[in-house]
């Protein structure tokens, strides 16, 4: 059968192409609008939040470790997320009720490595870079 040919087929070709686009995974993801609803950040790259508690998340098999994480409540929409605290000993710089800046953690919308269900990581604590605190370049501001 094939596609229609002729002088008056432009509308038919156009509408057919528009309908078929929705079968493309990338097009559907970009245009369906769930990015704003399902993503806790609401489409943004970073978000600020308040630390609720420190938790240890057990690593998946075959690894055996307790990954240091924190529960964070986002300021912009009140959603609660779990965020990973990178580097050895950086959990000591994070305290409850601190304001932290959270970013995505690698694979967009998916957990990374052996940490189940953790999709975000801590970047700043009390407006100070976590890496600067870790390396000793800056001190934690007095609150």
UniProtKB/Swiss-Prot annotation:
GO molecular function list: structural constituent of ribosome
Q: Which CDD domains match?
A: Ribosomal_S23
Give the Gene3D superfamilies listed for this entry: Nucleic acid-binding proteins
Q: InterPro entries in the record, alphabetically?
A: NA-bd_OB-fold, Ribosomal_uS12, Ribosomal_uS12_euk/arc
For this protein, the record's Pfam families field holds: Ribosom_S12_S23 (PF00164)
Q: What SUPFAM superfamilies does this protein map onto?
A: Nucleic acid-binding proteins
PTM Hydroxyproline: list the residues. 62
Q: Which GO terms describe its cellular component?
A: cytosolic small ribosomal subunit; ribosome; rough endoplasmic reticulum
Subcellular localization: Cytoplasm, Cytosol; Cytoplasm; Rough endoplasmic reticulum
- Is the Endoplasmic reticulum keyword given for this protein? yes
User: Matching PROSITE patterns, A to Z?
Assistant: RIBOSOMAL_S12
What family classification does the UniProt entry report for this protein?
A: Belongs to the universal ribosomal protein uS12 family.
Note the subunit structure.
Answer: Component of the 40S small ribosomal subunit.
The UniProt entry, under PANTHER family, shows:
30S RIBOSOMAL PROTEIN S12 FAMILY MEMBER
Protein's UniProt name: Small ribosomal subunit protein uS12
Its source organism is Caenorhabditis elegans
